[in-house]
């Protein structure tokens, strides 16, 4: 059973409900009109000032609009037409000041305070227009035969000379017919060594005193009952350029007056199977390998002034059959 206190509270609530239920509808309408501006136009207008003098503010166009500038020149006090499909929001500061957020047809939001146009968002076109324009090169444009650009030719850097110590794929002369793996008997732009005659004669005479005799250039074979598993060729060469021990190319002193002869032996089929490979066990893979030795030669300095120095070069010495397992 309800206590007297709850009964009294319930009666008060009933009286309040009856009071609000019987409140005249026109009183609600009067209050709403004081707080909001009621219009039948399309769009929404919120938080307008309650003063009777507060106008329904139109939305001005952007200041950089050429059409708007032309209208302002013709009439100093233009009244822009209202774009009714924009959403406008007014402030509650005072009757002659207002703050609006408007959405343009392209979806961009804008701020307007006392007819001052402030953009909140930038369209894609505006963002693209602010991007720096890359510099144009003659290759990026159409060039007509009579244009000055067609007559312009950018300066070209001179071709690099053949360096002494580069790992070039073809360090020898272009017309070299017998290019060896480690030496060139003919090179382009070989220097004139006449200025080094005194130094070559006094300091490097030992390099030009050897008198090697050419040997048989046929494949190495022993007696009638001997045969090597890898075929090779012996040569006596006078190289003008060679591969050093550090795998860089360098010019070698070799001309009509000062000659350095070296004897080399190269594999006919380097990294190829040895002869009689089928007779080896299946677990072994016989391969012909080129072996090298080092020999010191009088060479031309790689950089700086023309000079003679000593350097070690890789000399192909023999061809051996090596067994690989697996």
Swiss-Prot record:
Residues 162-174 have a biased composition (Basic and acidic residues). SUPFAM superfamilies: Cystine-knot cytokines. The keyword Disulfide bond applies. Keywords: Antimicrobial, Cytokine, Developmental protein, Disulfide bond, Fungicide, Glycoprotein, Secreted, Signal. Residues 69-80 have a biased composition (Polar residues). Disulfide bonds join 230-288, 267-319, 274-321. Coiled coil: none annotated. The keyword Secreted applies. GO terms for molecular function: cytokine activity; growth factor activity; protein homodimerization activity; receptor ligand activity; Toll binding. Residues 56-82, 152-174 are annotated as: Disordered. The record marks 220-221 as: Cleavage. Residues 228-322 form the Spaetzle domain. Glycans are attached at residues 48, 114, 164. GO terms for biological process: antifungal innate immune response; cell competition in a multicellular organism; central nervous system formation; defense response to fungus; defense response to Gram-negative bacterium; defense response to Gram-positive bacterium; dorsal/ventral axis specification; dorsal/ventral pattern formation. Residues 1-25 form the signal peptide. Homodimer; disulfide-linked. Ligand binding induces conformational changes in the extracellular domain of Tl. This may enable a secondary homodimerization interface at the C-terminus of the Tl extracellular domain. This is Protein spaetzle. The gene is spz.
